[in-house]
């Protein structure tokens, strides 16, 4: 006999299940603590996963002082540059000044006819953010840069000083992250049109069932005379915008100082040419997918107290 009651299929945490609007998600920067100084975000490109050797220095850990092997994700993080500076008041941009018109942007947008000088006399603002773009042409991924809005931590004076220090200069990953935790925003792998078994995890019906095995037994009652949104149906799976909180940074380095490239390069990616970032665990998206790294929104003590020394990639 069938069961009359069972939990609904699929989580309402992620709804509607449709394709992401843009490949690089935006951020609600008001939720980030402004106590942290400097830029609060950076753009990285997923290289792939690897097994890494770590020395566990976490207090009260069963493997403290020992070498362990775990999975990690490698990201290539080419430097960024500032395109424009936005002055916010009451949560709305009050003024925007374009300060960069490099040749890297010719395929992305119409470059400004001339660069503007940063108006230091403009005082009627509450917050400064910048529109930054990645110098992805230095990598083997593509040539067209990615643009995003990045907030700056600290007081108004400290934010303005940070912008002045990096006008027409490259921003390396080491200026934004050093160690600790990081939140990662990105779009997952796209699976296309999938049935309800793969999309919602429903069970197969009896093999002699009529009108199909990999489908729901009933799509709802007679009345209301419509199919409810909660009924598992076929549709889009993957290519969803997702956030992974509190990822542990294991290593930040430069290829010129420490080469971690395999002999034939990373599968589906190639060789890293610029700086790289190694994060413990897995991250969303396929190889070459752009990801937005931000300072942690809600750091936890459990993740923050974990300490590891990076030894190298496992052979």
State the predicted function of each range.
Residues 1-315:
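Extended basic (Lys/Arg/His-rich) segments that typically form rRNA-contacting surfaces
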């Amino acid at each position: 006999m069938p069961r009359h009651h069972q939990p609904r299929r699929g989580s309402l945490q992620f709804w509607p299940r449709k394709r992401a609007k843009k490949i690089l998600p935006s951020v609600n920067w008001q939720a980030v603590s402004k106590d942290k100084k400097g830029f609060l975000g950076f753009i990285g490109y997923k290289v792939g996963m690897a097994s890494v050797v770590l020395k566990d220095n976490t207090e009260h850990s069963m493997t403290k002082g020992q070498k362990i092997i775990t999975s990690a994700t490698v990201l290539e993080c080419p430097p960024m540059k500032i395109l424009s500076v936005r002055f916010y008041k009451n949560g709305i941009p009050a003024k925007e000044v374009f300060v960069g018109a490099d040749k890297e942007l010719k395929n992305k947008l119409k470059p400004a006819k001339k660069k503007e000088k940063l108006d230091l006399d403009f005082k009627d603002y509450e917050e400064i953010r910048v529109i930054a773009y990645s110098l992805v042409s230095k990598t083997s991924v593509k040539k067209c840069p990615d643009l995003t809005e990045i907030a700056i931590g600290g007081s108004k004076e400290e934010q303005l000083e940070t912008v002045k220090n990096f006008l027409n200069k490259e921003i390396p990953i080491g200026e934004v992250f050093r160690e600790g935790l990081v939140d990662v925003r990105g779009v997952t792998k796209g699976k296309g049109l999938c049935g309800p078994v793969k999309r919602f995890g429903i069970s197969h019906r009896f093999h002699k069932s009529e009108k199909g095995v990999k489908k729901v037994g009933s799509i709802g009652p007679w009345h209301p005379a419509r199919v409810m949104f909660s009924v598992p149906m076929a549709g889009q799976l993957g290519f969803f915008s997702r956030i992974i909180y509190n990822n542990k940074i294991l290593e930040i380095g430069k290829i010129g100082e420490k080469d971690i490239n395999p002999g034939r390069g990373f599968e589906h990616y190639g060789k890293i040419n610029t700086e790289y970032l190694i994060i413990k665990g897995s991250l969303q998206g396929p190889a070459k997918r752009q990801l937005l790294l931000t300072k942690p929104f809600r750091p936890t003590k459990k993740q923050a107290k974990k300490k590891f020394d990076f030894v190298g990639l496992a052979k």
